Amino acid sequence: MSEPLWRPAPERVAASRMDAFRRFVNQRHGLALADYAALHQWSVSAVADFWQAVADFFAVDFSAPPTRVLENADAMPGAQWFAGAELNFAAHLLRRRDDHPALVAISEDGQREQLSYAELAARVAGLQQHLLALGVQPGDRVAALMPNTWQTVVGMLAAASIGAVWSSCSPDFGAQGVVDRFGQIEPRVLIACSGYRYAGKQLDMSCKLAEILPQLGGLQQLIVVPYGGVQPCLAEFASVVSTVHWDHVSQPAGSPAFTALPFAQPLYILYSSGTTGVPKCIVHGAGGTLLQHLKEHGLHTDLGSEDVLFYFTTCGWMMWNWLVSGLALGATLVLYDGSPFEPASRPLKNVGEAASARQKQAKKRSLHGVNEHSEPVFNAAKATEVGFQRSAAERLIDLIDAENISIFGTSAKYLAALEKAGVEPHRSHQLSRLKAVLSTGSPLAHEGFDYVYRSFKPDLCLSSISGGTDIVSCFALGNPTAPVWRGELQCKGLGMAVEVWDDDGQRLSEGKGELVCSKPFPSMPLGFWKDEDGSRFNAAYFERFPGVWAHGDYAEETPHGGLIIHGRSDAVLNPGGVRIGTAEIYRQVEKVEAVLESLAIGQQWQGDVRVVLFVRLRDGVTLDAALEAEIRQVIRANATPRHVPAKIIAVTDIPRTRSGKIVELAVRNVVHGLPVKNTDALANPEALALFRDLPGLQ
């Protein structure tokens, strides 16, 4: 394509924080960096100067200044950032203390709750006092088995304020999946919900907690949050561990205190997906996470105090940690808990009155008690009048207008589902404040870009972003000062020396290869939990190319300075020795109207590898010879004959992780008769049985 899908207006570029940062760097260092390409090149050449500039531009408050920005700059792993510096992560997320909305929590049934920045700080202070009274100290673990709601954010901030390490799972995890994670890190305190809702079902957590608690050694206290319409029965767990009600430990209590902690103080423990064994416990530091998220939110996403940020996520996915850091920019965060395709049982607000209603109702909707649920601004009769209750597929789109969302984050799979459902938000919604759409979880197909600009609005920055739990951030993401090109991630992140290498470790200026990062960055993990000699950590990222981070993505650079991600390296297909990224096939299959979703693997066959494509079809559609021919023709016409699958098989479900990523490796193992080591990591492990002993693959 010769023209970009979107190009920012000059006034939008000039008003962006990215351009302000470019001018800031030029003035400080006497440079003449003219554009993003020059700024990025400087950021990876003068790495220490760049990260110091980020800290200063965003006014990071060091309780003790660093003696040096970067030590052991050539060591990866081994580089040390901001030695001697002290700060507090939670303090930076709570710098704002006024009545501006900090969190808006919306549940599947339509319940809406709101906390201002002042109220959020007071709630954090209350829980902080309780944790301190328990004797929780820096380095202790506080874990949560919670939905994406305001109580979870309060718990994280209270833990971080005193230097405890936060780790969370969503309540839909199976008991063994939770034990596989929390059992390794031995939390001192567990915050858990009494129940939750999903897809219209009310689910009680009592039995799951009863199974989990005896297996968590060192647990001192369980804090139960009433949620999902399930009233907690504390006596059920009191014989196993001290148990208290959330209401009794989280009442507003003035202003929190913040412990000054080293830059590399552990902040989060996140987990690998765990489909190849017990999940790896990835430890992230406070300072590196803060700097990276300030950069990504403030510069790459152009998030500011006037913005409303939404990302569809659960507390078991790194995007929750990423989302919450938006508080450091003073923005309003919209939290959604539940299915994105479940109609609300309560009406949402009228689109046209959303902005004024939020201001007028701020005090009325603020939270003074856990059981005091705020009512929607509009009643059911009014909602029916304006016709705002629409199809289930539009549930999250409704939030854009109802909450005046300016930055809307979701997944490539969700956007594809909207397109398949025929949803055209520009026809049914105003989207007046929407300035950016973010997509991650899997590569956004070229056609997905077309859909967003055709069916949302033409004047927005569509940012397909890519990184991972491993770095709790991104390697490639958006740029509000640059054009958006079809199918491309706009740019490599500032300060991220991202390159594409061949198998021999040579950089590729064109063509597909391994995505690597050749220089250290602050949000590299501190290591893996209980990996004292660092051997597992080193094997995970630095074994393939010593001294260079190999991320495991199959990618290529573009002439515009961006990237295209073709899938995971370990899922690459290799028929006849030709490497094919699975995303290259998925992109074409999405064009077939009858197919809802697909998954491709390479099957060992007669001394070679053959491509097998599994398809999930629309209701009432069968995979006949005509449909098979159509799928093959679309792939052959738009890719190459090598991409055409040898076998196409219809299945009724496709297994995925709890963050929505399809699991090619697990399916490949099942097809080859190999074990899948940790099915508890999957949202729908029962789907694996669909791929076992298939006659067409024998």
Question: What are the language-model segments listed below?
Answer:
Residues 147, 189-208, 229, 338-341, ...:
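Adenylate-forming
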Residues 161-247, 411:
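Structural core segment of the AMP-binding/adenylate-forming
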Residues 99-101, 223-224, 238-271, 278, ...:
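Conserved pre-ATP/AMP-binding loop-to-beta segment of ANL
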Residues 224, 637-662, 674-698:
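AMP-binding/adenylate-forming catalytic domain of the ANL superfamily
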Residues 169, 173-194, 209, 398-401, ...:
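AMP-binding/adenylate-forming catalytic core of the ANL superfamily
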Residues 299, 401, 435-562, 569-572, ...:
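Conserved AMP-binding/adenylate-forming
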Residues 288-308, 316-406, 421:
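Conserved AMP-binding/adenylation subdomain of ANL enzymes
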Residues 38-42, 103-157, 174-179, 245-247, ...:
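Conserved AMP-binding/adenylate-forming core of the ANL superfamily
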